[in-house]
Amino acid sequence: VRDAYIAKPHNCVYECARNEYCNNLCTKNGAKSGYCQWSGKYGNGCWCIELPDNVPIRVPGKCH
């Protein structure tokens, strides 16, 4: 498990405005919790706590 930005296909973050949206998204994917990281490295994106290793995360490089 790891703490990371959960990624959509093609290495894009889930953009967000509310913590509730990210918490639901992250826990649905097996994480302990999640919140909306505002003005982070990739803009406003969902950050998950203890996300399982099989779930894709945002990595350096382009979002297509």
UniProtKB/Swiss-Prot annotation:
The lineage of its organism: Eukaryota, Metazoa, Ecdysozoa, Arthropoda, Chelicerata. Expressed by the venom gland. It is found in: Secreted. Residues 2-64 form the LCN-type CS-alpha/beta domain. SMART domains: Knot1. Has the structural arrangement of an alpha-helix connected to antiparallel beta-sheets by disulfide bonds (CS-alpha/beta). One of its GO terms (biological process) is defense response. Keywords: Disulfide bond, Ion channel impairing toxin, Neurotoxin, Secreted, Toxin, Voltage-gated sodium channel impairing toxin. One of its GO terms (molecular function) is toxin activity. It comes from Olivierus martensii (Manchurian scorpion). It comes from the Eukaryota. Alpha toxins bind voltage-independently at site-3 of sodium channels (Nav) and inhibit the inactivation of the activated channels, thereby blocking neuronal transmission. This toxin is active against both mammals and insects, and is classified as an alpha-like toxin. Disulfide bonds join C12-C63, C16-C36, C22-C46, C26-C48. PROSITE patterns: LCN_CSAB. This is Alpha-like toxin BmK M2. GO terms for cellular component: extracellular region. It holds the Pfam family Toxin_3.
